[in-house]
């Protein structure tokens, strides 16, 4: 890793329908083999379903679901004198969003519904209600951090 300069984050173009950078990032995470239009169609269909179920605005419903999955702490391995400790660290805001979106997409892919749009809509509505696989993943990460709170002084 070169140490000359810090490379800034790439600017992401907002999505064409809602003008949200967060949604554009979500589409990019869902995208497989560079098929962006397919990923966009899936996300927009899922958001439409989610908005009908919740009675909220598309972006607002998506934001609520994402909020319930965002982790605040995680554990990182730290080697100290021959033994490895799981040290709890706070998650940076950009990584919070990335992890939440990744977990939602992973959970949706594992579901057994008919179409990906339906799976995604179901996972997002579960996340909005604080249940589902993605929320369980966040709770597991938080539980792990809580269990290893004793090693917090090894932070770097």
Curated annotation (Swiss-Prot):
- GO biological process terms on file: translation
- Which positions make up the signal peptide? none
Pfam family for this entry, one: Ribosomal_S7
> What is the name of the protein in this document?
Small ribosomal subunit protein uS7
Q: Indicate the family of this protein.
A: Belongs to the universal ribosomal protein uS7 family.
The UniProt function text for this chain reads: One of the primary rRNA binding proteins, it binds directly to 16S rRNA where it nucleates assembly of the head domain of the 30S subunit. Is located at the subunit interface close to the decoding center, probably blocks exit of the E-site tRNA.
Q: Does the keyword tRNA-binding apply?
A: yes
In terms of CDD domains, this protein maps to:
uS7_Bacteria
Instruction: Identify the InterPro entries for this entry.
Output: Ribosomal_uS7 (IPR000235), Ribosomal_uS7_bac/org-type (IPR005717), Ribosomal_uS7_CS (IPR020606), Ribosomal_uS7_dom (IPR023798), Ribosomal_uS7_dom_sf (IPR036823)
Q: How does it assemble?
A: Part of the 30S ribosomal subunit. Contacts proteins S9 and S11.
Q: Does the keyword Ribosomal protein apply?
A: yes
